[in-house]
Amino acid sequence: MKINNVDMQQAAAFANEVQKDKSKAIKVKKITGSWNFPEGNPQFSAVLAHASGTTTVEADAPPFLGGAGQKPDPVQYCLFGLAACFAQTFASVAAEKGVTLSKLSVSAENTVNLSAALGIGNEPPTELVKITVTASGAESSKLSEIEALARDRCPGVYCLTNPIQLQTELKVE
């Protein structure tokens, strides 16, 4: 049965599997992309694998940073990932609670200071990300409860609000 476009049978089966063996909750996510050198192409592209196949995603810097602005920039993709993750978590929590949503939209916004990226300052690139959720289908108090649970459970929110170790590796060919 689907609620809010969430397959509750699949989600419940996975939750039961994880309850029996917590290692089943661990999923590796990886993308590999390439910088595109020929003019006229977006600067970066990657093929993302998913359960139904693959999707090519392209990014391009805005003109003021030397790109052509042909595609969304990397920060927009970060915000998209956060908004999509939060929406998926919100819809799933609502479904768990038996709430059938009639509307759900999520906006993710930040202000970017590019001085450090340009090498002419050390100001933080961003100091705030704002998520705005517009939802209907239940009482305000129930939607607030769902929003709080989504904030607690969303992997994208966790990535922004907790220190995560970053490793970089350079391979010279």
What do these predicted ranges mean?
Residues 1-80, 92-173:
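Extended beta-strand/beta-hairpin segments
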Residues 79, 85-87:
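Compact, glycine-rich, soluble single-domain proteins
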